């Protein structure tokens, strides 16, 4: 595997995962099984308030080609084909949704020791073209992420980011929404033995002068059980406990409360993921 700056989406990812991953206020259940031919079948059901959503996903691997098919309750089909290492460091992704005739997209990703590039284009008459690139190393990296609408001739997205990584910390700064939104994040490993880490994110919108500060932490109570907590400057506090009761199978309980309106009911989320 190439060690380098990675793709643009990885800038600030460690802090985002610590602060937001697995926190939810829904009830979610998923189970994965394997057919005799080796096809992975994952059934997922989610309850959002009074709304019930579900999908069934099929994944097949043949050498360096992975094919995914997802069938959703809204009668749509999402098909994705991924080809890894067609050339050293290159990944090709082709996807489309049925019956949406304008959903086709092709994406190319290339990872190098000193660069990470991703480009995608919609398979339509006037597609939107996206390009993201990162240069640097696994210590210091700088990159950009832009989208161009060929129909209007305008840039619909212009983002830029910077990341600094050491053994126990990662700091990043991104400028999004064409320079209107600034995000700074920090991730620090406090105790590797117990997977203890802290993270923080500061967001500032220049047009409205609104700022949000979010801080959080994670800690492993034992090799199979971990806890996470976060709070932001708006007074929203969240916490979760996750237990791996068998390999690759997780049970997660999460909660969220508005500390400025304690008369409101707390939001509680449950998630169960079963894998053989």
From Swiss-Prot:
GO terms for biological process: defense response; response to bacterium. Expressed in shoot meristems, root meristematic zone, lateral roots, leaves, stigma and anthers. One of its GO terms (molecular function) is porin activity. It comes from Arabidopsis thaliana. InterPro entries: Porin_dom_sf, Porin_Euk, Porin_Euk/Tom40. Belongs to the eukaryotic mitochondrial porin (TC 1.B.8.1) family. The keyword Transport applies. Forms a channel through the mitochondrial outer membrane that allows diffusion of small hydrophilic molecules. The channel adopts an open conformation at low or zero membrane potential and a closed conformation at potentials above 30-40 mV. The open state has a weak anion selectivity whereas the closed state is cation-selective. Involved in plant development at reproductive stage, is important for pollen development and may regulate hydrogen peroxide generation during disease resistance. Consists mainly of membrane-spanning sided beta-sheets. Disruption phenotype: In vdac1-6 homozygous plants, normal growth, but small siliques and decreased pollen germination rate and tube length. GO terms for cellular component: chloroplast; chloroplast envelope; cytosol; mitochondrial outer membrane; mitochondrion; plant-type vacuole; plasma membrane; pore complex. The keyword Transmembrane applies. Keywords: Ion transport, Membrane, Mitochondrion, Mitochondrion outer membrane, Plant defense, Porin, Transmembrane, Transmembrane beta strand, Transport. This is Mitochondrial outer membrane protein porin 1. It is found in: Mitochondrion outer membrane. Coiled coil: none annotated. It holds the Pfam family Porin_3. Induction: By the bacterial pathogen P.syringae pv. tomato. The gene is VDAC1.
């Amino acid at each position: 595997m190439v060690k380098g700056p990675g793709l643009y989406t990885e800038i600030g990812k460690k802090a985002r995962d610590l602060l937001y991953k697995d926190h939810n206020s829904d009830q979610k259940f998923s189970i994965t099984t394997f057919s005799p031919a080796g096809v992975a079948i994952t059934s997922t059901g989610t309850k959002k308030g009074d709304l019930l959503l579900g999908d069934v996903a099929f994944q097949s691997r043949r050498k360096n080609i992975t094919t995914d098919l997802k069938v959703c309750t809204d009668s749509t089909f999402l098909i994705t084909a991924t080809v890894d290492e067609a050339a050293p460091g290159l990944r090709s992704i082709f996807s489309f949704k049925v019956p949406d005739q304008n959903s086709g997209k092709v994406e190319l990703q290339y990872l190098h020791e000193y660069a990470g590039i991703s480009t995608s284009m919609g398979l339509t008459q006037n597609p939107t073209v996206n390009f993201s690139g990162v240069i640097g190393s696994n210590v210091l990296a700088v990159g950009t992420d832009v989208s161009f609408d060929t129909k209007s001739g305008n840039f619909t997205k212009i983002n830029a980011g910077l990341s600094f990584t050491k053994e126990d910390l990662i700091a990043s700064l991104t400028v999004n929404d064409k320079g209107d939104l600034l995000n700074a994040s920090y991730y620090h490993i406090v105790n590797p033995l117990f997977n203890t880490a802290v993270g923080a994110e500061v967001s500032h919108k220049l047009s409205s002068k609104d700022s949000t500060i979010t801080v959080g932490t994670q800690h492993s109570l034992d090799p199979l059980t971990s806890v996470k907590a976060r709070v932001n400057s708006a007074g929203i506090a969240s916490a979760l406990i996750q237990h791996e009761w068998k390999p690759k199978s997780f049970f997660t309980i999460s909660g969220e409360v508005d500390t400025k309106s304690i008369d409101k009911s707390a939001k509680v989320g449950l998630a169960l993921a079963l894998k053989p």
